[in-house]
């Protein structure tokens, strides 16, 4: 997907991927196109997984408490199964700034 975006040449200066693995894939496509991360295109992932910490350059990523996410998902699912009103929740997240943004 990143390679196709770069082929269009529409002046992309940043990418926010839906997870860290996709962000690392975007970084590879950016480098294959002869561009540099973060000098030419900044990249941010989502998960703050081990992938983000070991990527080179180290990946900036959004960290979310997966335990809290799992608990909230289970509570909402149980409420829905019981026929109770399901109220959306907003969970806290944190931007972990590293070398790619």
Where are these predicted regions, by residue range?
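Flexible loop/turn connectors
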Residues: 8-101
């Amino acid at each position: 997907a990143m390679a196709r975006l770069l082929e269009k040449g529409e002046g992309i200066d940043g990418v926010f991927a839906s997870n860290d693995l996709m962000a690392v894939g975007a970084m590879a496509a950016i480098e294959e196109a002869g561009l540099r991360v973060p000098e030419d295109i900044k990249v941010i992932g989502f998960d703050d997984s081990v992938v983000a910490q070991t990527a080179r350059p180290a990946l900036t990523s959004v960290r979310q408490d997966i335990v809290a996410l799992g608990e909230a998902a289970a509570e909402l699912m149980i409420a829905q199964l019981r026929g109770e009103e399901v109220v959306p929740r907003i969970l806290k997240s944190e931007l972990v700034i590293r070398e790619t943004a």
